């Protein structure tokens, strides 16, 4: 069935253009799990001598070229920065900052990426479990699958992290990569294990290259003893909602799968209302689960860029409603503590600011009525 969502978010300002020398995370798929490279366009020219900054933004584990996880002053203080950085914005400050791409860019590059050194994982066969071989789950917060064989660490591995929510609440979300063929069963094992009521998918199946395998059935499939049945598909302008039932033995659960289709290929959206609508829909669905909702799974392709934008927007919307202020910098740092690289580019960081500026204006309009 086709439903139309009323566009009650007034997009008063277009998303400002990001300067062309923005840093772009260039993820290039290969036949097997893939690699990530970073193109730094004009970064050194803009900031002068910044060797440590270049090291932080480089692909982790690329020591052959003299970059990556080499010790630098920036890296030594990265953990402290992620724990302490904060910039509380009131309404007027938020609106001004959202329109200043140079200020946002400078702030973005101060935030350590907190990627994981691949050498931290010594698990044979791990390459088959990762879509991108340099985007790995931070060990302290990673999801561990229940395994019948404790001697086989690969069977408990999935590229996913628990993510804290508003006010540091534990395990509100799970950020994960888009499943590949070899991890579809693992993905559904995680859904069942974590009792997940909601999945948010923010990628197309292909965008020049494959970004995610189609891991849900047309009608019904069984994975690891869990019967997965699509009961209904609802099409809206910006997303598709699948109502799915999960059954194992006599236990049956409901699952809502939101597939956001309005994120354009290779860039960020030029309008914020579609994402704000999705955030609101997911919040309302989570509230229906009661005060102790199990983790919401969010994924794109690598599980850090668009995934980070969605989770940051959701957290910051809650903060604006409850406190009347927002701290996007602190939220980004919290996300990167839990999973490295969350909110992947300057352009995405700017988009989150624009979305929050728009959301604050909408809240102000509602309060004045």
Swiss-Prot record:
A GO term from the CC aspect: perikaryon
Tell me the enzyme class: hydrolase
**Which Gene Ontology terms describe the biological processes this protein takes part in?**
exploration behavior; positive regulation of long-term synaptic potentiation; positive regulation of neuron projection development; positive regulation of protein import into nucleus; positive regulation of protein targeting to mitochondrion; positive regulation of receptor internalization; positive regulation of response to drug; regulation of neuron apoptotic process
Tyrosine-protein phosphatase domain residues = 104-359
The disulfides recorded in the entry are none
Q: Which reaction does it catalyse?
A: O-phospho-L-tyrosyl-[protein] + H2O = L-tyrosyl-[protein] + phosphate
Query: Binding of substrate: at which residues?
Result: 265, 300-306, 344
Q: What is its main location?
A: cytoplasm
Q: Which SUPFAM superfamilies match?
A: (Phosphotyrosine protein) phosphatases II
Domain of life, source organism:
Eukaryota
Q: Which residues carry this modification: Phosphoserine?
A: 49, 72
GO MF terms, alphabetically ordered: identical protein binding; phosphotyrosine residue binding; protein kinase binding; protein tyrosine phosphatase activity
Q: Where in the cell is it found?
A: Cytoplasm
Kindly provide the name given to this protein in its UniProt entry: Tyrosine-protein phosphatase non-receptor type 5
Gene encoding this chain? Answer: Ptpn5
């Amino acid at each position: 069935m086709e439903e139309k969502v009323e566009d009650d978010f007034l997009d008063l300002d277009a998303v400002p253009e990001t300067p062309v020398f923005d840093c772009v995370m260039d993820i290039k798929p290969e036949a097997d799990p893939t690699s990530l490279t970073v193109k730094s366009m004009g970064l050194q020219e803009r900031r002068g001598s910044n060797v440590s900054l270049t090291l932080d933004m480089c692909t982790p584990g690329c020591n052959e070229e003299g970059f990556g996880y080499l010790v630098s002053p920036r890296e030594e203080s990265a953990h402290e920065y992620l724990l302490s950085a904060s910039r509380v914005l009131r309404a007027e400050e938020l609106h001004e900052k959202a329109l200043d791409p140079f200020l946002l860019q400078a702030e973005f590059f101060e935030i350590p990426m907190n990627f994981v050194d691949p050498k931290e994982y010594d698990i044979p066969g791990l390459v088959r479990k990762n879509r991108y071989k340099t985007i790995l789950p931070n060990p302290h917060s990673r999801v561990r699958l229940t395994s019948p064989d404790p001697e086989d660490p690969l069977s408990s591995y999935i590229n996913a992290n628990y993510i804290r929510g508003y006010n540091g609440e534990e395990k509100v979300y799970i950020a994960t990569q888009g499943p590949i063929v070899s991890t579809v069963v693992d993905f559904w094992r995680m859904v069942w294990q974590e009792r997940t009521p909601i999945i948010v998918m923010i990628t197309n199946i292909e965008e020049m290259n494959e970004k995610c395998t189609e891991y849900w059935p047309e009608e019904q499939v069984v994975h690891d003893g869990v019967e997965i049945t699509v009961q209904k598909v609802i099409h809206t302008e910006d997303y598709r909602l699948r109502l799915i039932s999960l059954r194992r033995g006599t236990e049956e659960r409901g699952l809502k799968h939101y597939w956001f289709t309005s994120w354009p290929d290779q860039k960020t959206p030029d309008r914020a209302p579609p994402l704000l609508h999705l955030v609101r829909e997911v919040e309302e669905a989570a509230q229906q689960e009661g005060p102790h909702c199990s983790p919401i799974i969010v994924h794109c392709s690598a599980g850090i860029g668009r995934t980070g934008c969605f989770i940051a927007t959701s957290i910051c919307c809650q903060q604006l409603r409850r406190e009347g202020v927002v701290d996007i910098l602190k939220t980004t740092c919290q996300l990167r503590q839990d999973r490295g690289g969350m909110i992947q580019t300057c352009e995405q960081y700017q988009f989150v600011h624009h979305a929050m500026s728009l959301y604050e204006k909408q809240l102000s309009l509602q309060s004045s009525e």
